[in-house]
Each structure stands twice: as C-alpha cells, then as structure tokens.
Amino acid sequence: HFNHCVAVVKLSDGTMMPLDPTWVPFCRELWSSAEQQQNYLPGTPEGTDLCITPISAPENHYVRIQANNVLDDKGTLKGSFTIEAEGQSDSNIRRIFTTGFQSEWKNALERQLLNVSPKARLEGVDYGRSPKDYQRAPIRMTFRYEIPDYALKSDQGVLIFKPFVLNNL
C-alpha cells in the first residue's frame, strides 16, 4: 500500500487531525472524507498510537434541490431548480468549474439537463460570481429551463411523466 505524507495537527482536546493537501484541492474539507476509516500513524516527538481517520456524517455531504415548475396541458415543463451541496457532494458538482475550461461551463451544465430529456432547453443558469471559489461557500446553482413533451398525454387525457429527480440529475 502506497502512503504519502500528510500533516497532522494536535487539537486542544488532544485529538489528532490529519490534513492532506494532495487530496483536497477544490474541496471544502481539510481532510477528504472520501478517505474515511483509514489507519495512520502520526510522527510526533512523543510518539503516538495508531489512529484512524474519522467518519464524516452524511449531513456533511448533503444535496438539496428545490424546484419551481409548471407543467402545461401540452406536457411542456417550464421552471427552475436550485441545487445546493456541501462536502464531497459539493466537490463532485463543482468539478465542472474547477477542472474544465470556463468556455465549456454552460455546455457542461446543459449536458446535465439533457440527461433529463434530449428535448430540454437550458434558458439560463446562475452559478454566482465565482463558482471556482470552493472556500467561499457551499455550491449553489439555479437552472432555468423548458422541456417540451416532458409529459405525455394518455388516451384518457391524463399526463404521464417520470419525476424530475429520477432522471439522472
């Protein structure tokens, strides 16, 4: 098993907190929670026992989606949704901004909407002033869109559709 160097900080309560600059670029965490429950041995002058990296609770990695949509009688869905995320969820969503060219941001976001429907049209997206600035705050984006034929009308006149969040978004 390859291991690399990390820094360890001793907190005021005596616990050790590992810091790993190689795993957390563009991540809001000081220690990547993708590296949970791993053993490590801090090199301190007084010596220490084998430690284990902490578990990060799910609420530290939330994804929240709030939608405001209107489905017309022709089956066209119009509206917006705001997505907010923190922790590893933030890192995964923010990757569009931190690893891609700025000229491709809109196309990358539109591809996410096209996962819902190939007929989707991204009318606009607000990702704030500096979505690359992962240290400022959790990621928050608002999409505005229209999806023609999102719902199909049955012979009885009932609109049938698959819930938006079940469409790989």
What are these regions (language model features)?
Residues H1-L169:
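A sensor for short, sequence-defined functional sites
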